[in-house]
UniProtKB/Swiss-Prot annotation:
It comes from Danio rerio (Zebrafish). Residues 110-120 have a biased composition (Basic residues). SUPFAM superfamilies: Nucleic acid-binding proteins, Ribonuclease H-like, RuvA domain 2-like, SH2 domain, Tex N-terminal region-like. The modification Phosphothreonine is found at residue 1522. PROSITE patterns: S1, SH2. Pfam families: HHH_7, HHH_9, HTH_44, S1, SH2_2, SPT6_acidic, Tex_central_region, YqgF. Residues 1-196, 219-248, 482-512, 1611-1726 are annotated as: Disordered. Residues 806-865 form a coiled coil. Histone H3-H4 chaperone that plays a role in maintenance of chromatin structure during RNA polymerase II transcription elongation. Promotes the activation of the myogenic gene program by entailing erasure of the repressive H3K27me3 epigenetic mark through stabilization of the chromatin interaction of the H3K27 demethylase KDM6A. Plays an important role during early patterning and somitogenesis of the embryo. This is Transcription elongation factor SPT6. The keyword Nucleus applies. The keyword Nucleus applies.
Amino acid sequence: MSDFIESEAEESEEEFEEKDLKPKKTQRFMEEDEEEEEENTEDQDEHGNLRGLIDDDDVEEEEEEERGEPPAGEDSDSGEEVRHRRRKRSFDDYLDDDDLDLIEENLGVKVKRRKKKYSRVKTMDDEGDDDDEKDLIADEIFTGDGDGEGEVEDGEAVDTLHPRDDEEEEDDEESDIDDFIVDDDGQPITKKKGKKFSGYTDAALQEAQEIFGGDFDFAEFDTEAYDHAEEEEEDQDDESWDRPKKQTKRRVSRRSIFEIYEPSELESSHMTDQDNEIRSTDMPERFQLRAIPVKPAEDDELEEEAEWIYRNAFSTPTISMQESTDYLDRGTTTNFSRKGPSTIAKIKEALNFMRNQHFEVPFIAFYRKEYVEPELNINDLWKVWQWDEKWTQLKTRKQNLTRLFQRMQSYQFEQISADPDKPLADSTRPLDTADMERLKDVQSIDELGDVYNHFLLYYGRDIPKMQNAAKGGKKKLKKIKEVSEEDGEEAEVEEEEEEEEQKGPDLKQASRRDMYSICQSAGLDGLAKKFGLTPEQFGENLRDSYQRHETEQFPAEPLELAKDYVCSQFNTPEAVLEGARYMVAMQIAREPLVRHVLRQTFQERAKINIKPTKKGKKDVDEAHFAYSFKYLKNKPVKELSGDQFLKMCLAEEEGLLAIDICIDLVGVKGYGDQTYFDEIKQFYYRDEFSHQVQEWNKQRTLAIERSLQQFLYPQMAKELKNKLIAEAKDNIVKSCCKKLYNWLKVAPYRPDQQVEEDDDLMDESQGKGIRVLGVAFASGRDTPVFCSLINGEGEVVDFLRLPYFLKRRNAWREDEREKKQQDVENLKKFLLSKKPHVVAVSGENRDAHMVMEDIKRTISELEQNSSLPVVGVELVDNELAVLYMNSKKSEADFRDYPPLLRQAVSVARKIQDPLVEFAQVCSTDDDILCLKLHPLQEHVVKEELLSALYCEFINRVNEVGVDVNRAIAHPYTQSLVQYICGLGPRKGSHLLKILKQNNTRLENRTQLVTMCHMGPKVFINCAGFIKIDTASLGDSTDSYIEVLDGSRVHPETYEWARKMAVDALEYDESAEDANPAGALEEILENPERLKDLDLDAFAEELERQGYGNKGITLYDIRAELSCRYKDLRAPYRPPNTEEVFNMLTKETPETFYIGKLITCVVTNIAHRRPQGESYDQAIRNDETGLWQCPFCQQDNFPELSEVWNHFDSGSCPGQAIGVRTRLDNAVMGFIPTKFLSDKVVKHPEERVKPGMTVHCRIMKIDIEKFNVDLTCRTSDLSDKNNEWKLPKDTYYDFDAETDDVKQEEEQKKKQQRTTYIKRVIAHPSFHNINFKQAEKMMESMDQGDVVIRPSSKGENHLTVTWKVADGIYQHVDVREEGKENAFSLGHTLWINTEEFEDLDEITARYVQPMAAFARDLLGHKYFHECNGGDRKKMEELLVRTKKEKPTFIPYYISACRDLPGKFLLGYQPRGKPRIEYVTITPDGFRYRSQIFPTVNGLFRWFKDHYQDPVPGVTPASSRTRTPASVNATPANINIADLTRAVNSLPRNMTSQMFNAIAAVTGQGQNPNTTPAQWASSQYGYSGGSSAGGGGGSSSAYHVFATPQQPMATPLMTPSYSYTTPGQQQAMTTPQYPSSTPQSSHGHHQHSSSTPSSSSSRVRTPQPKASSHTAVDWGKMAEQWLQEKEAERRKQKTPRMTPRPSPSPMIESTPMSIAGDATPLLDEMDR
């Protein structure tokens, strides 16, 4: 392009030097402009810029001129050339603010302001530090800038559309799209080169008007061109394009095309000069548009690249499990196992065709099959094309980095040469050939990044010095160049130096420094080198997995050595060692070999752990996509599949999940304990046992650990994450392509038999091909149906509007029936007159069934009555049609049509030719992305997805071929032309434009060159895919008609085709009248003659003559001569049942499946009609004497005969069998009666009413009937045993989920406890506050003061809080009875079993006595704080006192904060302290179950009896432990069922006792019983054991399973009576949490507890129990139940807390009564 600009610019300069060419009128306008500009000079600086605005580009150019340097990127251009180009650019016509203001004023709309585009290279500030320098060098390496390979490579990775030379990029930094505007003849219409605008044709004007709808005269541009050019030339020095506003009078009537239209519009319409260059260049358009240009390559490089592509693209497996979605291969295989090493040679051939011969993929796939098949199919060739781009990028970056290495090597050599005797500093690391070799061996971008980061670590600080040194040697180099101008190498060096000089003056050292630089400047390099191994040696040890290099031991201890390095930054030896370890860790982490080994190991071993966030716990339910991996533990990344990881990352982005990728197993003990760190640290060890070696080993270990944990692991995890995301996205792109492939592979609809038409009835405009009637409708029943008839060419011939066609034939209203009939008659007339071959009905919703039935019925009547030929009726998916209906293209094509009629047209065209219709949505608006190709398609890079989808179009369009003449005649097919091999949107439209301008058809392929001026490369690529209908041309042309132009035979093989025809007909080629063309025509009529040819011998002969291997091509030619351009697409077939269901419901198997939770609306109750033989089953109620209908259960019939009349009259609806519902997607649902509820439902109408919305779960889907069976039973909806929910991941962390569920439940209970109902109670001590507020209030109150507040237990409870001591408050539960309403105070108040009249009595009789007793203890001489009654503190105090006075028995009393109302009584008679509790009651002090009214009496008795055994502590106490159930509180026991169970027990208890209970309760220990059955049979069981159900072992009833448990006389340890709620939780039996350890995993069997657990003994019947005949177990159990029932009557508000609480037997003992005054459990838990 630069040559083009140069030539154009030179020409334009010559023209503008002639002043005579400037019209006078233009001069006058210019003078006015100059005068007005002078008036506004006060706001401008000396350069004409608005004050405060800086034009960096001008400033930079001026500086460069002063320095005599060309701008960056123009290596060898002289200053004259730079100025030359700047002059050329001076005629750019930018729209300044005045222009935009004027346009806005005239048009009345806001105009998009121009922004800087394409300015990719930023100038460096002179004060830039070396960080900026590093960034610049990284940019140079990784974007390809400054490549010495030639101008073509420069800037290659930057601009996907316009690969421009660096010199142009740099110079045109402020350029915009306006620079590139051309008309469609390729004539530049900007004033960039100051050229005349004399090249506009009527065609250009027409084209612009067609595109933009504008009406303007190009002729006006000619004179204005001079005017603008001169203005720009004169104003260039005074102002930049960012000019200040001027009140200049502009000529609004004459404006150029780029003044009228937005640059973005011009670009999207391909009207820029880049587009023109693409059109005119003889190279396939897609080659020119590739982000990284296609470059020619030598054979050696092709060999190397082919191996690289084979290794990376075809033989290396993906990290995650990605199935091959290459639908062109048979079967689903992994994407690397099918290609053998022979593929490499085929890849090399393909690369040779692409890079050196510029053949596009379809051409290679169709016309060079011998060189790529069978290893490579067309999709593989596209993959080679994509990987070639990656290879080129990698190669370029390697070359850039190699140059940087070489420059650094030269710099180091110069530094060392300056003083050869000076020893190398510790911080200096020579850049040697090993480093260069390592760079040469780099095989991936990751490895290249490793090498570059390694370089920066060691040489980053030297880069500024190197640059400055390079500038210093510039003059010498120039002199050398002058002496030897012909030496190309020296010239290259000089160019490189110039590049560096352009960066600015001498670079300063960085002011910002990282930790490594600080350590380096402190001189810690020396210490770091004494760790024993270099990073390279450690890397080799790691690679070989053994200690290849022994660790060298420095003969001094680390701390001693570190003292020599102490400095201001590191002022202690420990800090020095820390810094040295940091340096070693960083060096190891940057070592490329270490990173390479670790990268491989990390990817092999990496595991994913996932936990939900707080938001995720709430939001991720079973309907959420992240449900199956909400909790994951140690899932190997290798077992990720498809797009799973992308879903994980999306959930993480939404803040739902936290993902952790690590190399070691998490939370696994006993297996896999050894971490990767433990494995590799031995490679940095010295295996000796001296103290010195051990100290160094410790330092090495810490360095390795830091290197892994701080640097390598996070970086590798990030890298791996990006790769996994890329693989998942690639999977999505492939899935989208596969779906589009399946849509495009369908051939046009063909009727079963060609219908012979009556010429009189048919209009000529109908055309050949099949006629289709498209039918479209909307979802509302009141909307009209639109029909559109298209002819064989896809053009709309006629249409019909049927406003009432959606009404039902048997509608209730007569006028609707009549209107429907009228529409049917109209349709009949239309069908009779137009005779379509097929009717295509839009698959909008379930109404499509009804529409199809009505149309079929109508056609059937016409076939019988009017002899209408057979007309097919097909259902067509309308997704594409709806998209087309709403697109801009449909509005442009059918501006006057209503949207539904446009949809009808698209439906008809889709069945006529899917490929053409899908191409309609491939517009610049990217409408094709609106098709539902994949649920996650919007998370893929749009450009990548578009590119892949367009490849599918390219493949299919070239297989089918494109008739260019048809595209001109029928514009709606023009969208196919852009996909022809070698062409594109620009070249395709240009081809059509030339043909339109010449007003001619393409009569043969030769005209592509002669008339359309196509270059040889593009012609070879596209010729075979452009088909010409030679039969239709016939006698209408004088040109030579080549019959092979209508076939897939490529022009390069026409001679062989003729030869085959001549040989097949056995003509004599040497005869004078031999006519190969005639032979061809004869063969086309009798293709079977070709079967006798020996094509293999022909192929051998061709190869011998040097034409190459053409074996497959010859067979293709024979096939083509047998049937020219035979359609290879799959024949059309009607959609199957599943496709119809998905089409009409708009569901997919992923969105609608068995087990899904849905909502539906009840429509009615379904009844089964009564059968005649069932009439005699009427039932008579003996109490009322009335009869009941056996079906509808109506029970008010006085006589049996009335029941029969009820049957006969039809008033009996029948037996209710279920509920009918309707889902949102119009599918009908049915809920059988037994699935309405877990309880028996006789009358469904009592449960649900029509119109009610119910939550259900899908049990069965009938896709044929559009029906689903549903359940709305609570057990099925909750689905605790995962019978219906989607399966969870194999590595799902059920334990973590169970723990979280438990925590959440406890949290909820705490929250529920803190809530209370505000009460209206008039009492000075009453406050509407919660317990926290109460305790805060009491902080400032005196001991014994009272606060009365609402209780969290409910509206019939109050809580009395009194202050026991500082920081200790007791909460007493008060139960109210006889309440008038929820807010008033009850008439009687109860504390446990004691009744009070009012709150004052409670204060006086209950609280104040206790407060007085508490004061007595608080004032006792042996009272001690002990930190709020801390047992440990008490024990320490006793031990200390005993030591001081060994002959005394010390004792102390202390108020207990954990158990308010209790005091610790500690004493130490001998060696071990003992601690007991004294409880405050209103009656006195309770100690060892006795009440003492005074303190003296208490301690007197204590001193006398302290040696007595504590009553109740007997071995029998263990028998009374709580059964192994979380919920085994008395409130959970169903007394009625339990009594029934007890009554059924045998008198003499035997080992079958449990079975007898199980028979009654239905709760046998059947291991096959599912948790769902347990849940339904355990009344009051809330499933607290686990999320997945805990099996039967947690049933409260299992306590009766063991005969040795004497339930009639339960014993109780005194420790229970003293236990307050806070301790009950701690002292409950240990078997609760462990009773069902596996339950959370859904293993439905009884888990046994630990051997120590009493529950395991409880559940084991022992044979000797049967000998206990003296005990009447039935009576005992009955007696126990009666006691329990009496207790329940006393306490009418049972506590429902599912936490462990004391066993039911405890409260029945007489001893526990006194202990009931203790605070409540839930008050203490808060």
